Curated annotation (Swiss-Prot):
Gene3D superfamilies: 3.30.300.10, 3.40.50.880, HUPs. InterPro entries: Class_I_gatase-like, GATASE, GMP_synth_C, GMP_synth_GATase, GMP_synthase, GMPS_ATP_PPase_dom, NAD/GMP_synthase, Rossmann-like_a/b/a_fold. Residues 204-391 form the GMPS ATP-PPase domain. Signal peptide: none annotated. It catalyses: XMP + L-glutamine + ATP + H2O = GMP + L-glutamate + AMP + diphosphate + 2 H(+). This is GMP synthase [glutamine-hydrolyzing]. Catalyzes the synthesis of GMP from XMP. It comes from Chlorobaculum tepidum (strain ATCC 49652 / DSM 12025 / NBRC 103806 / TLS). The gene is guaA.
Length: 516
């Protein structure tokens, strides 16, 4: 990111909330990055952060192979805030003691701020309030030069900070999770740490991001031509518009119709992308894809066939382009870096691992620093219509992973018709924008039914709708029963070949959002 931005580094110890910490910081208007906990201090110093945050984690600091930060992190001259496991790592590093607690805390707890001590900048304007706990260990002995600034009924040491001879270190620790919404003053507390203690001036915004990216794209691409595979989804659309702002008609977008799109998708996508002024070529390769997928039931084989065929089609539509635009997001980048150590195998994300090396295309990933909600905010700043920005995520393999079992044109058409009814009803009921993602799945089973006094033996369709903020975790959407009944009745009566509709009430984890 631009060196002029003041940034915060979050060291990840494996917490499920690490990304949430980074997002909360950005909501305050400050740029944040996530690094593995084992990142060396000299690497951190090179990024010139104004503050460092140690995340929570699932382990115990007294384990033989406990995750610990580079000790020199505390000598970089910037404020450090430890959250949950991060607090315990601080206590251990400075000579305190951490033990397993006989009274674990999970969920809401009442935090009592220690008003007897001289005012803590961290707790300025923060009263006694509910906080979110998730820990089984506790600090039983404070390190020398630290004081307790808050407690709960089960955690005498709920918050600590350096003082006296160690005050200049500006090291703070919280046993609770300020990044979680259930911690009522959590965002205010983070703001106190970043602005009042670290002295950071908020300068991160969609507008500043766009300005920097346009400059960077111009610098990287120069006079070269650039190609972008566009799908009509949020990520590829925002990425394409952003690159187009930088290099104009030197960007060539390719939209491949693989025959696995939603009903009338190709026509709709071309229509709503037209006002954006992008140079787009529509390639109809549906016969090629469906021919190769005919009769294939294995989801892994489907993905491999689709991936290989897409590469071949895409390659034929590339001319003298030197760069490839991809809509890689920050969670994709984070998932590719292990917190377990530098010796662990790095996972190659699907966005960057598929195109053959012989194409010799260099990557431009203008969104790789953004979370999904930030992509939408950037899209709004770019003037992209809300209908495009709020489209639900759609898997790369398309309907191939929503038609379970053998893939045929007929089964795809059945799914398209049913899914269109589901989505139309969500929109007309004002529910579409209230769920993260909604879709239909055609199951590889049939069931007995009765229609018009005749016995039927036809397909079962599953409806899936989930609520989420980033797709990393998700809960099933509690749609009204009357709404589900209406959708079910319409599908059974209007879509030939379906006689039973079910609703998926699984959350992620343990289930995934998609069925395949």
């Amino acid at each position: 990111m631009a060196t002029s931005l003041q940034s915060v580094i979050v060291l990840d110890f494996g917490s499920q909330y690490t990304q949430l910490i980074a997002r909360r910081i950005r909501e305050i208007g400050i740029y944040s990055e996530i690094f593995p906990y084992h990142t060396k201090a000299e690497t951190i110093r090179a990024h010139q952060p104004k503050a460092i945050i140690l995340s929570g984690g699932p382990n115990s600091v007294y384990d033989e192979k406990a995750f610990m930060p580079d000790p020199e992190v505390f000598s970089l001259g910037v404020p450090v805030l430890g959250i949950c496991y991060g607090l315990q790592a601080i206590a251990k590093h400075f000579g305190g003691n951490v033990e397993s607690s006989s009274k674990q805390e999970f969920g809401r707890a009442k935090m009592l701020v220690n008003h007897d001590e001289s005012e803590s900048l961290l707790f300025r304007d923060i009263p006694d309030s509910d906080v979110w706990m998730s820990h089984g260990d506790k600090v039983t002995q404070l390190p020398e030069g630290f004081r307790v600034t808050a407690s709960t009924a089960n955690a005498e040491v709920c918050a600590i900070e350096s003082f006296g001879s160690k005050a200049a270190l500006k090291v703070y620790g919280l046993q609770f999770h300020p990044e979680v919404q259930h911690s009522l003053y959590g965002k205010q507390l983070l703001s106190n740490f970043l602005i009042d203690i670290a002295g950071i001036t908020p300068d991160w915004s969609p507008k500043s991001f766009i300005q920097h990216q346009i400059e960077e794209i111009k610098r990287v691409a120069g006079d070269s031509t650039v190609v972008c595979g566009i799908s009509g989804g949020v990520d590829s659309t925002v990425a394409a518009v952003l690159v187009s702002k930088a290099i104009g008609d030197k960007l060539h977008c390719v939209f491949v119709d693989n025959g696995l799109l939603r009903k009338d998708e190709a026509v709709k996508v071309m229509e709503f992308l037209k006002p954006l002024g992008l140079n787009i070529s529509l390639v109809d390769a549906s016969d090629l894809f469906l021919g190769r997928l005919k009769g294939v039931a294995s989801p892994e084989k489907k993905r491999k066939i689709i991936g290989r065929t897409f590469i071949q089609v895409f390659e034929k539509n590339i001319h003298d382009e030197k760069f490839l635009v991809q809509g890689t997001l920050y969670p994709d980048v984070i998932e590719s870096v292990s917190v377990k150590g530098p010796s662990e195998t790095i996972k190659s994300h699907h966005n960057v691992g598929g195109l053959p090396k012989r194409m010799k295309l260099k990557l431009i990933e203008p969104l790789r620093e953004l979370f999904k909600d930030e992509v939408r905010a950037v899209g709004r700043e770019l003037g992209i219509a809300e209908d495009i920005l709020m489209r639900h995520p759609f898997p790369g393999p398309g309907l191939a992973v929503r038609v379970l079992g053998s893939l045929t044109r007929e089964r795809l058409d059945v799914l398209r018709d049913a899914d269109q009814i589901f989505i139309d009803e969500l929109k007309s009921s004002g529910l579409y924008s209230k769920v993260w993602q909604a879709f239909s799945v055609l199951l590889p089973v049939q069931s007995v039914g009765v229609m018009g006094d005749k016995r039927t033996y036809e397909n079962v369709l599953a409806l899936r709708a989930v609520e989420s903020t980033d797709g990393m975790t998700a809960d099933w959407a509690h749609l009204p029963h009357d709404f589900l009944a209406k959708v079910s009745n319409r599908i059974i009566n209007e879509v030939r070949g379906i006689n039973r509709v079910v609703y998926d009430i699984s959350s992620k984890p343990p289930a995934t959002i998609e069925w395949e």
